[in-house]
A protein has these predicted regions:
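Short, small-residue-biased leader/transition segments that mark boundaries at the very start
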Residues: 1-6
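Long, low-complexity serine/threonine/glycine- and acidic-rich segments characteristic of extracellular
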Residues: 9-116
Length: 116
């Protein structure tokens, strides 16, 4: 699996670590960062993963040079003072950089697991 990590969620920093979860966030493994690694810039990373064909949720998170780790959507909602998903002002959805989960179905199709 190859993708991009966006450091902008930190508000100002350089990505130093990217972790990937292939089990819905229960466990995390380090990905390999690719050069160039620049401040406030997209950083490509690689993560070798063999998909066994079972439905799963895959997601990545990054940590910057200040030690700030990207929040899950629930951690972000709590920081904003929301107690449950239904109370979230959906117009704010474009203004956050929470961990983005992606659902991979048995047929290989990929859908947004956060807002779908």
């Amino acid at each position: 699996v190859q993708t991009c990590a966006l450091p902008i969620w930190s508000g100002g920093g350089t990505v130093r670590r990217v972790e990937v979860s292939t089990d819905g966030g229960r466990s995390w493994k380090d990905a390999r960062l690719q050069e160039p690694i620049l401040r406030l810039a997209h950083v490509r990373f690689r993560f070798d993963w063999f998909w066994d064909g079972a439905e799963t949720v895959i997601q990545s998170r990054c940590t910057d040079d200040q030690g700030e780790t990207q929040l899950s959507v629930m951690e972000l909602y709590k920081a904003w003072g929301y107690t449950e998903y239904k109370s979230l002002d959906k117009s704010r959805a474009i203004h956050f950089n929470a961990i983005q989960p992606w659902r991979i179905a048995k047929d290989g199709s990929v859908t947004d697991a956060m807002f779908a």
